[in-house]
Amino acid sequence: MSGVPPAAALLGAAGLIPFAAGALAAHGLMPGISNPVTGLLILQGYGAAILAFMGGCLWGFAAQAGRTGWREFAVSVAPGLWAFAVTFSPDALLSLIIGFVFLLALDLMFRGWGLGPVWWIRLRLPLTVGVLICLSVGKFA
């Protein structure tokens, strides 16, 4: 993650801890969590919260750049609305996987529009891969 501010890299990586804990717990491998369903609920709840949070980051990029049109703001609310819509669906983890792939596409779109820091994709790509691995591990528990 060269060029990424150390604080963003470290805190971003720390944000993967609940995903990893949920994935391990879903397989009964997390000390102190005896019910694998708890791991799935951790992944669902935390995954939805982070997906919505990341949409808020995109909103912030548009606002910081002084954008006033609909395009950037409308696109930035999509991850949060998706997270809300799928949180309690029967296949929430698959839906969150789709949501995080879509979010990465939005990250790339915003960079193409010149929004967000130049290092954003270098941060987001490895974190998204980590999230997708953890959600997939939980999905196939």
Language-model regions, residue ranges each:
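Transmembrane helix-loop-helix
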Residues: 86-102
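Helix-adjacent hinge/juxtasegments
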Residues: 58-85
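Non-cytosolic membrane-interface motifs at loop->transmembrane helix junctions
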Residues: 37-42, 71-72, 117-123
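Interfacial loop-to-transmembrane junctions
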Residues: 105, 109-131
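Alpha-helical transmembrane segments of multi-pass membrane proteins
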Residues: 19-29
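N-terminal membrane topogenic signal
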Residues: 1-14
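Small-residue-rich segments of transmembrane alpha-helices in multi-pass membrane proteins
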Residues: 17-20, 74-84, 123-140
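Short juxtamembrane and helix-loop transition motifs at transmembrane-helix boundaries
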Residues: 32-39, 53-66, 89, 108-116
